Amino acid sequence: MTLNTQQEAKTTLRRRASTPLPLSSRGHQPGRLCTAPSAPSQHPRLGQSVSLNPPVRKPSPAQDGWSSESSDSEGSWEALYRVVLLGDPGVGKTSLASLFAEKQDRDPHEQLGGVYERTLSVDGEDTTLVVMDTWEAEKLDESWCQESCLQAGSAYVIVYSIADRSSFESASELRIQLRRTHQANHVPIILVGNKADLARCREVSVEEGRACAVVFDCKFIETSATLQHNVTELFEGVVRQLRLRRQDNAAPETPSPRRRASLGQRARRFLARLTARSARRRALKARSKSCHNLAVL
């Protein structure tokens, strides 16, 4: 009888040890853009990454700045604008995102970035941006995660360092990738030359940055996260570009009452304008002047 009791106790212990843990108690790794949560019922806390399609809501008028609480009311949900930061490591993406969130003291464990939400008042109208600094984390995973990151944004900010030419070349390649990903829709893209305070170490001139923006049809601005120079102008410019794109897409196409010229006539006029060298220079100069104006398309 004693032997049987000991064998039953061993069997019970062995069964308890072999019982698998439930799925809900296993560890979850936040910070991956391509991993969707099982029940996305509210925004993650600031400083954490979200899934490819995070829940969106419209903050209440009483809220100011950035918030991590969600509301279950039916009228409080509205699409937010997701701004994806792209660029090589060390160009200052996380510094710009932290300044956007007014979060100066960063946790050492947040060096790979995260997601920051804040409501900005631009031109008398409130707009909520969700800035996603998850590009470095996605580069640690498979390439399809990076592709998901390139598709997740309402707008894109491509950052390079003016003191690092290789980061400038990488920014140009990222612009080409975005063009391939967003062929049908024209999303706002802003090329940012960060670390403008390192003037003595400059490897990329302002003229080169503007020329690149003109060629790739995007906006351009130089910033300094260290001096907090043009950081506010950058994110307010993102808001204005989003609004302009929204208005441009919503505007109905009104047919002109005049008779349109034939394709051959328009082609001849276009070629005649291109043959004039001065006209080309004027057009390029006009485009280079407008590429750094974030208040116009």
From Swiss-Prot:
Keyword Transmembrane helix: no
Presence of the UniProt keyword Nucleotide-binding in the record: yes
Binding of GTP, residues: G87, D88, P89, G90, V91, G92, K93, T94, N194, K195, A196, D197
GO MF annotation: an example: GTPase activity
Coiled coil spans: none
Domain of life: Eukaryota
SMART domains: RAB, RAS, RHO
Region (Disordered): 1-73
PANTHER family: GTP-BINDING PROTEIN REM 1, RAD, GEM/KIR FAMILY MEMBER 2, ISOFORM C
Family: Belongs to the small GTPase superfamily. RGK family.
Self-association and partners: In vitro, interacts with calmodulin in a calcium-dependent manner. Interacts 14-3-3 family members including YWHAE, YWHAH, YWHAQ, YWHAZ in a phosphorylation-dependent manner.
Protein name: GTP-binding protein REM 1
Species name: Mus musculus
